[in-house]
Regions:
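Basic/polar N-terminal segments that are highly enriched at the extreme N-terminus
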Residues: 1-6, 10
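Non-catalytic accessory segments flanking enzyme active sites
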Residues: 15-76
Length: 76
């Protein structure tokens, strides 16, 4: 059995830039008729969540927190 291998999270900036670009281009549907959350997620909430990920989420900060813990990969 192979030993666990130390691992650090390091998402390339190009990937994060691509994600922000795709979030900027998101096309939202109309809100489904009926009560919000009755037939899926509330449109306003999803739009707010998208804006947060696009404009405010600090991936590097959270990446550093996660890398503060010992991370490993292991074959299963």
């Amino acid at each position: 059995m192979a030993a666990p291998t130390p691992f650090r999270i390091g998402i390339p900036e190009q990937i994060l830039t691509d994600l922000r670009d795709r979030l900027r281009r998101t096309r939202f549907p109309d809100q489904a008729p009926g009560a919000p959350w009755a037939f899926g997620a509330d449109l306003a909430y999803v739009q707010e969540l998208c804006a947060y990920w696009r404009d405010a989420y600090d991936w590097r900060k959270h990446e550093a927190v996660l890398n503060g813990f010992r991370q490993f990969t292991a074959p299963v």
